[in-house]
């Protein structure tokens, strides 16, 4: 009888330990998720030059300039890591406004949207970029991109019109939402070709 009671007590203790472990694990996951995405109040402090474009959980980015890559506009193919490890994207040309009040994105064409102003991502944070749903419903696709910690410069993101029809888009339109995420253990700052817009100053990358 005593052995049966001891076994029951031991099983109860093991159940309690298991429940405590699960509870602790749940709390840790909740704590990790809580506050990882920066909300609108903090965003206005972190990005004062975008405070008028702060949404609920992100920043709405506007197009400043639009560029196109296609066979007609590009004078060479793209090269990455083939010749002396040089990175040479296809040249691309600015989409001219030509007196219109909006851009026209032609079917099955790939574009670069240059954001209308520079952005600085604070150290210890990254950004993820998403196409606003209105444009997704028009058949546009935003290429995957992450803004690295301590990046400073003007973003240029790829957009593809996958639809069989033209998409008309107003100048300076809010098209992309940037979600800012706090990271743990980040001690490396971005120092690539796009830092401080240095690559945009090379004529070959603007099709000039």
Annotate each predicted stretch with a short phrase.
Residues 4-208:
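DUTPase catalytic domain/fold
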